[in-house]
């Protein structure tokens, strides 16, 4: 596991990174100026924007983001995105594949109705240990997402940083969450997103190997570059966003 950079260590010491995470509007204002230097993509590229919680106060922001993506190219399902990577579907321009992490109740109350209104598919990566906890989905809610045509993926059992887990624990988190989801939902679970997701500090090749052995067809990280036909589904690049961010900040994170 690679050590944090000096800048990352200093930000951690000052508490600035956690403060920014607690204040997404400030974070968005900091990211936005760099977006002036980025142009929306005009060439072919597959992007995987993802979100976490979407409280009602940020619903309008999420809708703005999704409409901005749709102006550039289609928002497609996870199946369709993997078909692009494996050569089963052409990539003629910018294309976007939307996902959400953890298991927040706002997915039921805010996100799912919006996606239905816009006709947008999404993948929901579930941390199984959160299901049924206050502020999170129930298993019935997860079944409703499946019934609405969305994809369910695994996000481990307890949301650990996999790099901090021993081999046995990592396998239990990766394979155990898949089994639990399949038992509860009665559907095959084929896609995995690593918590935190930075290959430099949060996960390693061992975890990809464990996911492949468990029967997953895709493994998602938080690397940012666009993907193209021929790239590996076992090393998906996703771009983390917050619905409070202005569109220039989204441009910085997705297209930067």
Residue ranges and their predicted role:
Residues 131, 138-142, 146-170:
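Histidine/lysine/aspartate-rich catalytic loop segments that bind and position anionic ligands
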Residues 107-128:
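A short alpha/beta connector and helix-capping loop motif
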